[in-house]
Amino acid sequence: MRICCLCLAAMFAGVVFATDMDQKAKVIATVQTVGAGVAEITCDDMGSWKFSVSSGQDAGRDVVTVRIDSPVEAMPPKFGVFFRVSGAGVQNVWVSASDRDGCHLWPQLWWGGRFAKYNSQLARDTPIAVGFNSTERAPVALACSEAFHPLTFGLYADDRTCEIIGRCEFFQRSAAKMKSYACSVMLDRRNGSFADAVRDCTRWIVERNGFTEAPVPEAAFDPLYSTWYAYLQDVRAEEIEDEAREAASLGMKTMILDDGWQKVDSASFYSATGDWMPVQSRFPDMKTHVAAVHEAGLKYMLWLAVPYIGDESKVWDRFKDKVLFIRGDKSPGRIAVLDPRFPEVREYLIRTYERVVGEWGFDGVKLDFIDEFVQPGDDPAAKDGFAGRDCRSVPEAVDRLMKDVLTRLRAIKPDVLVEFRQHYMGPAILQYGNMMRVADCPADPCANRKRMCDLRLTSGGIAVHSDMLVWSNDESPEGAALPILNVLYSTIQYSMALKKINPAHRAVIRHWLAFSQRHRDALLKGAFVPHHAENGYTWIESENEGERIAAAYAENACVKAGSPSRTVYVINATGTDVVIVDSTLPRMAEMFNTIGERTGAVRIESGVSRVHIPVSGYAKLAPVGKL
């Protein structure tokens, strides 16, 4: 490894000031890299901090490491790391933010705009940006080891030269005082495939931080039913038990009881949160209710909003002075976010979840809104000298809380299920749970597919779940199948009132649930490659040693049939009866409709063919003479 170190102090007189067009602080140091040119370190006010900068290589990737030290505890300075490389071959930029539309390569000049600025922190997205093109190569990929503190980052085009500018900016929001800090920024110029670039960046961050993924029980991959979209907050024990029996009859294995079990009404959405006890009029005996769902044949999980307490809860007076901030100024109706730096706050939350699993008998928890644990601009702890808190950093406290939750729940139930969802995703979150769900996008199969693919590339070995599926009750069977097919490469969650569902849709659900379970290993654990992120992933493939499953989501997508040594399934999710298939040899294709009925067989010649496959159905391919 080639190392270049610079120790800098505030005595630097010859600093270079950036222009307004560059939208960055003054350059205090530069360091040469092997493949990414000169990296710039920027900072407007170093204060008491000394900067040490080094560059090196890691498996052919350039890594710049910045360490800052102060002789006394102080607020860390705002600083940045910038790269400038050729823009050749870069047409799009991918980031993990599920609320951003498309894979835009924004101009550097637009950096200040909200939609062009990307942020990550412990429970918010992933510090990765990948520049790629329509051939699915990635000439530039950027990753940062900072997985806890807020980070602003991205890849941008220089309006004047079309060069790509990579930037990572640290401590743009206030943080707890410290004496030292270190981080690394990696730039990958190896021009690998898009999917590999995203996965490699994720692995690099995980390894750089020494993270260990949480154990993933096989049940985390089981299809499940959620009460959320079907019932919202209007849930009752008897009705949910009926739904559990319906779900089990269709092939679902787990149920999530979502919001509403703990409240009847409140002045605002969550102003009654915090006690986490069932409403007697809805769930008179939670333990007996859980047993009834188990009797139906399902595992059972419970939703909880981790950070919130409301002024209509019994614990409000106990914890109202141990919060990060309060929303609302009318009482009742105020909602507060707890401060996890207080040990008694963490203990209260952990004991709540222990009661859910240990006393009531739930098999797991859905832990919501942990992205709300954010230090406000003015840290309330500074006013009282951090009295009562056993750590100063909010991200550090959340990390400790989540690790302790998993440890103590696994002591009760070793195969406990713990679900999180976008946006609170990222390398650190992989340590705390074993299920990661797509962010809410009801009745939007395209968004569900895109977000599923993004999660599959960034979530390591944990089970990626779709957002809960809903569709119009008057859909055709083929139309009802499309939401399912769009997330076939994830663990599928359903959320419709099953007792009221269209009978034709029931057959669709039953068939595709059975299909997804027969091919579970290839779909959920195989070599997964989604294609053309710039177009929302128009076709997807995944395979294991025995079979290959490819799905087309656009009529003009060309699906590759792959090796003749595997059984090949081609899923038609285009909404038409045509799929373009590229086969290296002649094959026979056996056709099945959307409820699994065989409709015939045709011969496919080698090369590219327009193949007529039933709408929302599939073809099973085999070499001629072997079908």
PLM region spans:
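An acidic-aromatic substrate-binding cleft motif
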Residues: I205-E246, L250-T254, Q262-K263
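Glycine-rich, aromatic-flanked loop segments that form ligand/cofactor-binding clefts
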Residues: D196-F211, T254-L257, R282-G333, D415-E419, ...
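Active-site-proximal substrate-binding groove within the catalytic cores of carbohydrate-active enzymes
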Residues: A176-S180, L401-G617, P623-G625
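Aromatic- and acidic-residue-enriched carbohydrate-binding clefts of CAZyme catalytic domains
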Residues: W261-M286, K314-P340, E372-D399
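Active-site-adjacent "subsite" loops/lids of carbohydrate-active enzymes
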Residues: P215, D222, Y229, Q233, ...
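Hydrophobic faces of well-ordered beta-strands that scaffold small-molecule active sites
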Residues: F221-T227, M255-L257, Y300-L304, V365-L367, ...
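N-terminal accessory beta-strand-rich subdomains and adjacent acidic, glycine-rich linkers
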Residues: D20-E207, F211, V578-S583, M588-M591, ...
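Active-site groove signature of glycoside hydrolases
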Residues: G251-W261, L349-K383
